């Protein structure tokens, strides 16, 4: 098992996840997202710890609060935003939304 320590990189990633999640809540509250959105605000570090134990050969099946897992595992957030906006360049072609990544 890999040793996990709190460092600048972990804190920076947790803040990135928090900011993306807050942006989703803001978009949802103004009616700019279809369906619903389930954030992982307050659970950012669990996503980072979880993904830190995986290899690129692993398959990930998450729950309905999966944005943090996605961001940490893929190391990107742009296609996640496009997905929740219903755009074809989203991670699931814009049809998966928040719950089906």
What are the residue ranges of the model-derived segments?
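Cofactor-/ligand-binding subdomain signature composed of acidic, glycine-rich
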Residues: 1-34, 56
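Cofactor-binding active-site loop characterized by glycine-rich and histidine/acidic residues
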Residues: 22-25, 32-101
């Amino acid at each position: 098992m890999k040793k996990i320590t709190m460092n600048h990189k972990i804190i920076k990633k947790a803040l990135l996840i928090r900011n993306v999640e807050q942006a989703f809540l803001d978009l949802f509250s103004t009616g700019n997202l279809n369906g619903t959105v389930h954030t992982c605000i307050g659970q950012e570090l669990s996503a980072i710890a979880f993904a830190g134990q995986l290899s690129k050969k692993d398959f990930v099946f998450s729950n309905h609060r999966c944005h943090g897992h996605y961001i940490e595992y893929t190391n990107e957030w742009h296609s996640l935003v496009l997905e929740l906006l219903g755009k074809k360049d989203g991670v699931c072609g814009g049809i998966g939304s928040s719950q089906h990544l």
